[in-house]
């Protein structure tokens, strides 16, 4: 079993690294605007057609463009979901959503969270899935990558006050990266048996005479960008545990590869853009080491499972509850780590059915800010926030002015860094406290005790960190939870994104000082270790009390009561 786990983890990471390197080179060229003469003419013609100003933007203009696009997306998707009952491509006559569910869903998909308080097959029309959710999957992913591009340019440029053009970045990312990769991945999924049609649901009679309904729909096209864009929202309620979304062991492995591909490629792109590949490698080492330990712990906990089952005559104590037998314990555990280390939130097993400590690790990966690979764009800029914090602390320790890649890190950058790092944990803890202190919040808890607390903590952690996965035992399709989680998703996305752009705007105007013998090396094993320690320390200081009341208490109760 240990050998199988080793092969799964390292085989996945090795494959991702091999595939991500050439993509990282392509992304680096996009960051520098190297698209070729023919494509530049096409971009100029498209800009004239839509009357877009392609001049370079300062950080305030860049942020305004991103926020405007996403605000329009929320409004359009909200209206579409409310009105889907009278719109076409609705063969099952799905009614419009309630205002609070439509608001929650619109904010969820625009913020790259894809939290779903509904099951798609009995709630949404094909039009809502295609024109509403799938389009936002592209735009949300492009928004995150664009902000990462802006921050990378802040380190690679010097003595200017612009970060690029948001509209041009969004256009290039969508057209040259997300669309081609999604098309290839969708075709692969169709070859594996994932649905892609506009047929009405199929009503059948089984051999024993029972009626059965098979949902149909354009699944593969949404599935591809759901994974590549680390969005995570499933076409069906069971998400990637559903055989129409994830039918084979091969499709399951490719899904994990797709989730990790762009976050990994962005680290390579960062190294190339700042003319020091080892800087990107250092980030990957930090992410990879945390990922390996997290995956090993979850696999170990799920394999140990419930030893008391052996006394009852079971063949194995491994925790198979809530898991697909076609994937097994190890692959399901690895998928859970992949989807929560990133901001994806797609699931091929029910996290609510994991063991107490096996479920705690995915929750903790979200709570540390999803900087272990993280979401497309957001993972890189989230980890760079921790890099700036580490550089600042290291500078205090050695008595030197902190700097990163030759740029001095001063008071303004640290204020924005602290703000961006502290907002998601504050949202998690305050949101959980509000849910547990009100009758509306407590009424949604279906399981008593420590596990019920864990379900609430997981839900708010998932929303505030834009993940979208859930401990499904919590009843969340209520006005209280739909509004609470919508606010958490909105602030967790944009209250981090704006300070990141503010940091970029402050750094891009600074000179890039040459590295000296006294400079702190930010690519050494020592710095990588410090970076990991800072990430773990922030997570520990913030969430250990809450985790002790939830999964840790549940684990101890299990041992004491059995």
Swiss-Prot record:
Q: Does the keyword field hold ATP-binding?
A: no
For whether the record's keyword set contains Repeat, the answer is no
Mind telling me what this protein is named? Potassium-transporting ATPase potassium-binding subunit
Assigned keywords, A-Z: Cell inner membrane, Cell membrane, Ion transport, Membrane, Potassium, Potassium transport, Transmembrane, Transmembrane helix, Transport
Show the GO MF annotations.
Answer: P-type potassium transmembrane transporter activity; potassium ion binding
Q: Which residues cross the membrane?
A: 5-25, 63-83, 132-152, 175-195, 250-270, 279-299, 327-347, 356-376, 379-399, 416-436, 483-503, 526-546
| Family statement drawn from the similarity comment of this UniProt entry | Belongs to the KdpA family.
- Pfam families from the entry? KdpA (PF03814)
- Domain of life of the native organism: Bacteria
- Show the GO cellular component annotation of the record: plasma membrane
Quaternary state and partners of this protein?
The system is composed of three essential subunits: KdpA, KdpB and KdpC.
Q: Where in the cell is it found?
A: Cell inner membrane
NCBIfam families in the record, alphabetically?
kdpA
Q: How does it sit in the membrane?
A: Multi-pass membrane protein
- According to its UniProt record, where is this protein mainly located? membrane
